């Protein structure tokens, strides 16, 4: 049966990538359908109950700046908020929130159900319709066909998913959910490179059986941050602490003695796991010199007894998991509610994607999330947003859009994936960005909200608030420029208490704020520079933009130099075989990756500066040398 209505965009999957991918085109005015195997698990946190962190918090802010949902949802569901790296520079400061799983899922579902232009339908998808090399719809398990002008696939770990606990394994997309086996088989028939990855999750513990009295507490920040630029502390639910315990030699001995029952160490699992979130087995073996590892006991919500022991992800047998848990301080009598497990799943080589996340092989088919080789809710959501935007733009007949590396961490993420590919689950870090001083959490809206407005992703309220913030920043910077302190000023004594070396000549408020020891808050407590802005976001921008002005300008100059050829396009039909000066290795890599620009080509492993020069000369010779907006 063919459904009577033709959609502009169909999104398959209702996880973190799928929800953002569905909301974006709906906000842009396109008729959108979200297909999920279970509407009750929309926005489900399959692993750790947290959003944000180093690099990840930056992505969440970018999603929010573009009108996405994740930041708003966690502001309504976060039960502990912290600013990480708060003592370091603004480039690496990051917001992290512990989440109440139920509240988060409720926030996501409410947003989806109240979004105009978005329909939701519960059915497992078993096939993607492809006609004349273009995706035109999806087929569900009961034989119902939905037609569309573009399709976004966000299947997470469900494609041919296999769950491992000890030497036992079975098909599954995650605990309690079936694997998408039929869809995986169908996708393997398409002209796309497929491989396997692995991830894992720890056992869940019964809080009633944990001796919290002997454990160290970890509280959130006294001054609670918010994740969304439109957020408010008033949205946060009740805040509660986490607790900390540690593994010990007994724990490690048990793990070492059980490796013959580990699916990883016996070769049953073939997929590669996440480097930066290893299983406890991996940690014990890779860091054999350490006799202890810190484990965070994170509550899964305000209305549940489940606790997530962050740091003991494992696929060891259940009896070994019990031994691991009971070997740790405070957990001697703790019960396990859900066993930990590892899961293997299909993913597609992201080098087969355009930077818009459309597949190169099939027009109108977009991939987002873990099926592109990433790990993490935030990475998935950022991809979902980008894929949804471009699926919509394609239907509208408009030019595609994606952020560059100097504009957003989303740009770093996508460029790394599409240019270099990945053989292990990829996660974002601030260290992956060349221009991280420009890609801060605090300025994500300044970088991206005007673009979101042009694309039709944000409402009038957000746009008005953004413009008011920009006016506040400009007005305050100008005000501080105009206020001067002279050596004879009545305020000199107070100002000298703020600075490391007394003033010997006149200085403006801007001059003073450039000093490392002077903060905006301290400066505006001086009567001459009062009052401070009520708008805390604008005040933060004033301080950072003044204090780091020289460094920011230096990075912007670097970007301009780099951009001279970054955006030089390489036509899809460019024939590398005709470029005789290229080595066979370079030619083979360029033909394999098919970079869309000189900038992308330059980041492919093994592509030398000399090869880039040869490419530029040949593009010019063939009359193909042109720049594009990437």
UniProtKB/Swiss-Prot annotation:
Keyword Flavoprotein: yes
Localization: Cytoplasm
Main location: cytoplasm
Taxonomy, superkingdom: Bacteria
Gene Ontology molecular function: flavin adenine dinucleotide binding
PANTHER family named among the record's database cross-references: GLUCOSE INHIBITED DIVISION PROTEIN A (PTHR11806), PROTEIN MTO1 HOMOLOG, MITOCHONDRIAL (PTHR11806:SF0)
HAMAP family cross-referenced by the UniProt entry: MnmG_GidA
Subunit relationships: Homodimer. Heterotetramer of two MnmE and two MnmG subunits.
Function: NAD-binding protein involved in the addition of a carboxymethylaminomethyl (cmnm) group at the wobble position (U34) of certain tRNAs, forming tRNA-cmnm(5)s(2)U34.
Protein's UniProt name: tRNA uridine 5-carboxymethylaminomethyl modification enzyme MnmG
Protein encoded by which gene: mnmG
